[in-house]
Amino acid sequence: MDGVSTAILLLLLAVISLSLTFTSWGKGQLPPGPKPLPILGNLLQLRSQDLLTSLTKLSKDYGSVFTVYLGPRRVIVLSGYQTVKEALVDKGEEFSGRGSYPIFFNFTKGNGIAFSDGERWKILRRFSVQILRNFGMGKRSIEERILEEGSFLLDVLRKTEGKPFDPVFILSRSVSNIICSVIFGSRFDYDDERLLTIIHFINDNFQIMSSPWGEMYNIFPSLLDWVPGPHRRVFRNFGGMKDLIARSVREHQDSLDPNSPRDFIDCFLTKMVQEKQDPLSHFNMDTLLMTTHNLLFGGTETVGTTLRHAFLILMKYPKVQARVQEEIDCVVGRSRMPTLEDRASMPYTDAVIHEVQRFADVIPMNLPHRVIRDTPFRGFLIPKGTDVITLLNTVHYDSDQFKTPQEFNPEHFLDANQSFKKSPAFMPFSAGRRLCLGEPLARMELFIYLTSILQNFTLHPLVEPEDIDLTPLSSGLGNLPRPFQLCMRIR
């Protein structure tokens, strides 16, 4: 059977299957939603170029729990703090499955810590959390690595001599080096080909997956597998990244000492040796490669993207930048780098960083979840295996939780006495059982990097502050800041 005949047969089978699926639409206890069409689902009611905005608008028509069909796939969408919190935290076990994300799944095959499920996911997460803690995650030892890397970054920024530059690659190299030191055992020089390759693959994939191409692939993966486009580059990048990691793993195998692990890879290899005779073990080479990739991706792109958002925001609001610098000067001075111990004495700076994360909303739709059993929820019944999208943008912009959600306002995280206050609706790392395991590292990096930069430099835009556009470039996987250059002038 040739390719065309196969495609026609698959299309006919899909039509039959979808006709049966949509015949039962609206029956039972599913949440309400727009009526779907066979094959297309609700795509005519959604903008493929901006799925986030379309889903957010539908929540105003159908409420905080509604059903949509992304092509043939039925998805429950949750919006608003109370609803999302009830699902991810109060019913965390029921909503702990990982939903369909074809552009990732076609590479990971459900392997690795981010996209695995069930017992495999629980075992991998428990192991990874323990190993990351052993190598200093959230502790003084990892702080020392961040301070060291921060000093290298400051040296690079000084060499810009106050001239305009694009911060993307400079930030990515520095941020990526921290998670690389945990995974591979040492940092890379900034011109090391391996580091540059890692950053290229990660940055390129994050941009494509945040674009309409990435969104459409997740809706019609079988169709787009036959269509040329930038989505094909994602898989080439994935393959290149896997090869790079595999080379490093082979080098580790040649010098492995199980009694003296140097890094995450050593610990995983040792676990593989220990469970070699167990045919049901989840610790194998493919899992190691996928988990390492997940950690590199998560540990590089989101922090770098958040820092770029912070630069734009601080240039648009120079009074906020000046007040942060004033607090840094008062608490830290100029003779040493800021440390985590300083954070408790810097409530305004802490509030600004949290507000940047809320306002930038870097991962606005979260990664998809899935209910692992039939789940009663807010008067409806969500069938086992149903994918769930939690709109984190509607949490971070919930007017019941934040006084002026559409505005950048550090007062959202300050009490009447100007002391820092937490908000339960702060979920940039998601929440519940699928909470990002890199949260402690990311929070440390954001504080030390931003305060160190503002201690030494003032950020200057190339346009007037009022002309800076904070509207994100993409709203798929990630909210990316629009490309920009800036000048950093030594204070």
UniProtKB/Swiss-Prot annotation:
CDD domains: Cyp2F
Signal sequence coordinates: none
Cofactor needs: heme
Domain of life from the UniProt record: Eukaryota
TM regions (residue ranges): none
Keyword list, A-Z: Endoplasmic reticulum, Heme, Iron, Membrane, Metal-binding, Microsome, Monooxygenase, Oxidoreductase
GO biological process: epoxygenase P450 pathway; naphthalene catabolic process; response to toxic substance; trichloroethylene metabolic process; xenobiotic metabolic process
Membrane protein topology class: Peripheral membrane protein
Cross-referenced InterPro entries: Cyt_P450 (IPR001128), Cyt_P450_CS (IPR017972), Cyt_P450_CYP2_fam (IPR020469), Cyt_P450_E_grp-I (IPR002401), Cyt_P450_sf (IPR036396), Cytochrome_P450_fam2 (IPR050182)
Annotated residues for binding of heme: 436
GO molecular function: arachidonate epoxygenase activity; heme binding; iron ion binding; monooxygenase activity; oxidoreductase activity, acting on paired donors, with incorporation or reduction of molecular oxygen, reduced flavin or flavoprotein as one donor, and incorporation of one atom of oxygen; oxygen binding
Assigned EC number: 1.14.14.-
Subcellular location: Endoplasmic reticulum membrane; Microsome membrane
Recorded GO CC terms: cytoplasm; endoplasmic reticulum membrane; intracellular membrane-bounded organelle
Family designation: Belongs to the cytochrome P450 family.
Function: Involved in the regio- and stereoselective transformation of naphthalene to trans-1R-hydroxy-2R-glutathionyl-1,2-dihydronaphthalene in the presence of glutathione and glutathione S-transferases. It specifically catalyzes the production of a very reactive and potentially toxic intermediate, the 2R,2S arene oxide, that is associated with necrosis of the unciliated bronchiolar epithelial cells or club cells in lung.
Protein name, as recorded: Cytochrome P450 2F2
Organism: Rattus norvegicus (Rat)
